[in-house]
UniProtKB/Swiss-Prot annotation:
The chain crosses the membrane at residues 9-29, 39-59, 89-109, 125-145, 147-167, 185-205, 231-251, 259-279, 281-301, 328-348, 355-375, 397-417, 426-446, 548-568, 607-627, 719-739. InterPro entries: NADH_UbQ_OxRdtase_chlpt_su5_C, NADHpl_OxRdtase_5_subgr, ND/Mrp_TM, NU5C-like, Proton_antipo_N. It comes from Nuphar advena. Disulfide bonds: none annotated. The keyword Plastid applies. This is NAD(P)H-quinone oxidoreductase subunit 5, chloroplastic. NDH shuttles electrons from NAD(P)H:plastoquinone, via FMN and iron-sulfur (Fe-S) centers, to quinones in the photosynthetic chain and possibly in a chloroplast respiratory chain. The immediate electron acceptor for the enzyme in this species is believed to be plastoquinone. Couples the redox reaction to proton translocation, and thus conserves the redox energy in a proton gradient.
Amino acid sequence: MERTYQYAWIIPFVPLLVTMLIGLGLLLIPTATKNIRRIWAFPAVLLLSIVMVFSTKLAIQQINGSSIYEYLWSWSITSDFSLEFGYLIDPLTSIMSILITTVGIMVLIYSDNYMSHDQGYLRFFAYMSFFNTSMLGLVTSPNLIQIHIFWELVGMCSYLLIGFWFTRPIAANACQKAFVTNRVGDFGLLLGILGFYLITGSFEFQDLFEIFNDSIINNNEINSSFATLCAFLLFLGAVAKSAQFPLHVWLPDAMEGPTPISALIHAATMVAAGIFLVARLLPLFIGIPYIMNIISLIGLITVLLGATLALAQRDIKRSLAYSTMSQLGYIMLALGIGSYRAALFHLITHAYSKALLFLGSGSIIHSMEPIVGYSPAKSQNMVLMGGLTKYMPITKTTFFLGTLSLCGIPPLACFWSKDEIINDSWLYSPIFATIACYTAGLTAFYMFRMYLLTFEGHLRSNFKNYSGHTNSSFYSISIWGQEGSKPVSSNLLLATRNNNDKSSFSSCPFSNTYKIAGYVRNMRSSFSTHFLNKDPYTLLYPHESDNTMLFPLLILAIFTLFVGCIGIRFGQEVMEVDILSKWLTPSMKLLHQNSTEDWYKFVTNAFYSVSIAYFGIFIASVLYGSVYSDRQNLYLINSFAKMGPKMRIRLEQIINVIYNWSYNRGYIDVYYEKVFIRGIRGLAQLAHSFDRRVIDGVTNGVGVASFFLGEGIKYIGGGRISSYLFLYLACVSIVLLLVK
């Protein structure tokens, strides 16, 4: 056992070999390296698999009761100051290491085929391997200085991969947005680290926790306001990294990178880094009640905000991005209420489910690109999808499992962890628990909206006369899945027929004069005629992805089905302590858990949350499944036609407000644009004007004045007698005038 811990230092550095070898190959033998580029996927997967095996062995030892292991190497800078580097192995480290390596391996296998035709294939694998190295270094760090070093490396790799296709202006702007937003959090993190060093005189976690809790909390040796400020600055770094409100704005734009990296960022690396930091520092935060309240409040706001912003997105990856934001809010909420176990449990289950969904979306995008084009505005647009079930059955099945898991449907993984968070929230605040519970219904709604628009009904991209441009009225499917051609009725629950049209559309909600989209009106009667023209473009259909892309989906689907078993807690009378609780025992000794093991209460609370989730699924099925399926009658929808005109208008107004809020990202980006970006640019222009007119004016004025003064003196002393006589007579005249 001791030998295993002694060699744990290799964990971060093994994947680094791939980056170094690719770099040396491109430097020394570039032609040969590029010719055999597909071979580099094998060592990348192999080396990360070695780390996974090693991490699994460490995890087994932790579960079997091993203590925390730390190794430090001191680097003396002066006689009074030294930095220590090393590694820390504890339950949190082993959990994160397994998460990073398992998800990372699946993403690398998937990427081999997904990126095979990209010119940046080698660069992609070099970045990915370095990304894994940086994240593994972060989770094994024993102190704040080492954390900060790898924290910056994780951010750098994220920026490189978000802007991987840097020749596209949108990707370059997304990279800059992620960089600038995270700079705010990283600056706060650095100030917080320096502040706690000033308080405790140490960067080491163990020393930091002991000194702070014993000497400061108990003896009141430091100003509590200053300690709270430093803790908030540390938390600010996690807010930016994990895309929590209000520094979440970079996350949807980060979808401009390749889809495999989106899966890795959202499941196990970039956004998980902020959660890891809060979990690592929780023994410190838990002694500062104000910070715990702030953490839980920020988490709750993010839960609700992310869910509402996902409601009306058309881009499949951006919908998943807002879903990630909301689910990370659940984890942050759990950490804020002191439910350490539930937070890590949901981090695990969400990672596998979200990786499955992102890789599934990549499979969908990969199959749609030959049909609609390679622009993300089209290939990622759910408006152009539909009916993919018969073309991509394996992708559909795995995506469906991931969707059910994220909706919190038992017995899939996320059900157990999410409901444990909601259950523990009741102990902290009924208001928080109620909001978290009802947000589960929103999650179920937008996830099934995504699933139904993508897989159910008919393939909409092959309809003749279809335009994929955003200014096309056909394009504008709203939150409720219908045409958006009129400003008042653009967001109706379902498009309805024109009164001049004698035919009837039985499942429309309102019988009024709003014009139905032609593709919906003719869907059942003349669907096949849309595919009868001879244009070869319209004869294209999606196809199932290759085996190397399907294999990771199937493995992640298995994880999604069964990984929840590690944390199922029935209570001592029914079953022994679950695996996750045994795993976390050394870490949980440092914390006061705010959780309950009452199985009856868990089932009762789970019944409410699952019922709300099923209600969200039902509403999504009503609003989306009825339009794009072959069902002829849906009496619930038809009942809306009986409402009076005032009620319909009021309902439309409410829907418009919800749609506009969601589609426009809650107007937060607009606010930042007007207040911060334009404000900073205005200040920059003012500073530039002041510099040009005042600073440069004074400097240039002195130079010009010196020039003319020199020219004048040169002219006077130029050796001309007439000038001397004129100057002499002028001086004599002045003297005579003064004398008189």
